[in-house]
Amino acid sequence: MAVNEENAGNEVHRDQPGPLKRNILWVRHGTTLWNVEKRYLGHTEIGLLPNAKEELAPLHEQLSGVSWHEVYCSDLLRCRQTLEQILPDAIGQVKFDSRLRENDFGEWEGLTYDQLKDNPVYRSWIDAPQEVTPPGGESWQEFTGRLDSFLQEMLLEGRPSMHVDEGRESTIVVVTHGGVIRYVLSRLIPGLGFWDTHVVPGQAIQVQLDQQGNQWFGSRVTFPPIGL
């Protein structure tokens, strides 16, 4: 992913030791009733299931061994509730950002594939989401535009402090949604398509980014780390 450094307000200190890196942990929110019922869930405010604490307990334990320096979270309820379970100590420092919301499915919110499968507009959207917008919903360009804006801003923030120091690396944690994670991974990892990533509720995917010039190149790494 290319990052525009002009007028960014952050100078790249190329004379500092070590390459610029980012470790980003992308977390999908826990399970909601609509996830279980396989309904399209975009901007609708629905909370997690009553067993959220038990569902997210393994991720909470895994994150206890992670050194994080920034936490971002979608402002939707299911993500805020997820954050409370997995990183309660971060609540006072988290940056809530509406750009991290799931795609807005408009009139298709709350509907299932079986309810929509005979709709010709829906069929066209499935085949070419870049060209078709759900009625009353968000276009592909609007969805990806806000996510590109978030990525650009996140990668430019705090740059000098993120040089690798004696092999120690801190992590950025982002709590968000399945469609968001699919898109950002397709932007950050060369050759990865939108549908190539499968992420279930309550799962974390770690991406390591290395900067070459004004480009960031990502690779997926094992999470949790071996031995954690």
Each PLM stretch: what is its role?
Residues A2-N4, R22, V27, T31-D89, ...:
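Active-site-proximal alpha-helix that buttresses catalytic centers in soluble enzyme cores
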Residues A2-R22, N103-D114, L156, P160-S170, ...:
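Acidic, low-complexity terminal tails and accessory targeting/binding regions
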Residues G47, A90-S98, L192-P201:
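Short hydrophobic/aromatic-enriched beta-strand-loop microsegments
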Residues V66-R99, Q208-L228:
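Conserved histidine-centered catalytic loops in small-molecule metabolism enzymes
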Residues W68-D75, S161-E166, T171-V175:
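Short glycine-rich phosphate-binding loop at a beta-alpha junction
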Residues Q85, Y183-R187:
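Active-site signature of alpha/beta-hydrolase-fold catalytic machinery across serine-
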Residues I86-R146:
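Phosphate-handling substructures
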Residues G178-R182, D210:
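GST superfamily/GST-like fold recognition
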